């Protein structure tokens, strides 16, 4: 935790996170130029929450945006055109360009139509934000097969389907940026989210593989792990005073805080950033670790189950990870 503690105290002079549409940041943006001018961007799950804020900021930064959202409930049920249409309307009111798309990411052919929508509407595609998601939490032994599979389909398979449909375009034009959403539920762990955690950690592997495979074609792939209040965590219980206090703190972490790093990763200023995992919590940005060996042991004559028990495990146990959750690791108030 030493490096994390140092990161907590690092303040960048003059840095800020700006909510799209506010007067002063808008003036600053005009002075600085637009980081996504002329680009075509897909944002999945863009009808509400984090996806909405990403779509709004990308448009404010000059991108033409495909606002994808089938308008399902937090558990994936139902559908509505309104969320995507309302975001498109808001973008147009602010002088931007956007089209709505209502396809699901959970199946290959509909997902490919999201990419087709960008080409048909804007003639090109420069970036993909895989943000779409649902939640169906349950303690593992009570989790249904359907609950597990449906979350995997939207988060992991959805990220694959949309990325795969865009990959050949990016290969041909030798440029492009993928931004995938992971979670500390996968990176660290959480109760009752085996489906969500498996999907989100799978997305990290997907992103790294894309980064390795496509770096030679100048195509980038990164992950963002958000801390933000959205409808997907709006079902947190508030039965006790402690739970109410926790929710009050989380509600301060608005989804607009996540959008700036996503817009950055989509832009040319991030041309040398790929294969990384970033977390955002209020005004903090973290570069997250990736799996590497911690300790090693060796025995010239090899190991048996007995010698592992007697010598191997005792030597390694001091470096074991605890069964931590995200709240155990990020245990200070958001800045």
Tell me what each language-model feature is.
Residues 33-66:
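Canonical Rossmann dinucleotide-binding motif of NAD(H)/NADP(H)-dependent dehydrogenases/reductases
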Residues 102-116, 145:
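The beta1-alpha1 cofactor-binding region of Rossmann-like NAD(H)/NADP(H)-dependent oxidoreductases
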Residues 183:
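Residue(s) in the substrate-gating loop at a strand-loop-helix junction
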Residues 163, 199, 207:
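Active-site helix of classical SDR
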């Amino acid at each position: 935790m030493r490096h994390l503690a140092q990161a907590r105290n690092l303040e960048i002079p003059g840095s800020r996170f700006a909510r799209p549409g506010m007067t002063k940041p808008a003036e600053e943006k005009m002075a600085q130029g637009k980081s996504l001018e002329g680009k075509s961007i897909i944002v999945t799950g863009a009808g509400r929450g984090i996806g909405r804020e990403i779509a709004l900021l990308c448009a404010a930064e000059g991108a033409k945006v495909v606002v994808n959202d089938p308008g399902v409930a937090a558990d994936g049920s139902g559908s509505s055109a309104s969320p995507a249409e309302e975001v498109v309307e808001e973008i147009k009111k602010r002088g931007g360009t956007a089209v709505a798309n209502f396809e699901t990411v959970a199946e290959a052919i509909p997902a490919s139509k999201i990419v087709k929508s960008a080409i048909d509407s804007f003639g090109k595609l420069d970036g993909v934000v895989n943000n779409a998601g649902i939640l169906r939490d349950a303690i593992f032994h009570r989790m249904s097969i359907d609950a597990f599979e449906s979350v995997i389909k939207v988060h992991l398979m959805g990220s694959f389907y949309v990325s795969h449909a865009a990959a050949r375009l990016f290969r041909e034009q030798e440029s492009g940026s993928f931004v995938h959403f992971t979670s500390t539920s996968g990176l660290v762990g959480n109760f009752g989210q085996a489906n969500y955690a498996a999907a989100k950690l799978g997305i990290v592997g997907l992103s790294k593989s894309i980064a390795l495979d496509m770096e030679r074609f100048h195509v980038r792939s990164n992950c963002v792990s958000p801390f933000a209040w959205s409808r997907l965590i709006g079902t947190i219980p508030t039965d006790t005073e402690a739970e109410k206090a926790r929710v009050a703190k989380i509600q301060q972490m608005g989804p607009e805080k996540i959008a700036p790093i996503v817009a950055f990763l989509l832009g040319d200023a991030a041309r040398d950033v790929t294969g990384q995992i970033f977390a955002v919590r209020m005004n903090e940005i973290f570069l997250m670790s990736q799996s590497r060996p911690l300790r090693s042991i060796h025995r010239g004559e090899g190991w048996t189950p007995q010698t592992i028990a007697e010598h191997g495990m005792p030597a390694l146990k001091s470096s074991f990870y605890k069964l931590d959750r995200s709240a155990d690791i990020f245990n200070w108030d958001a800045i």
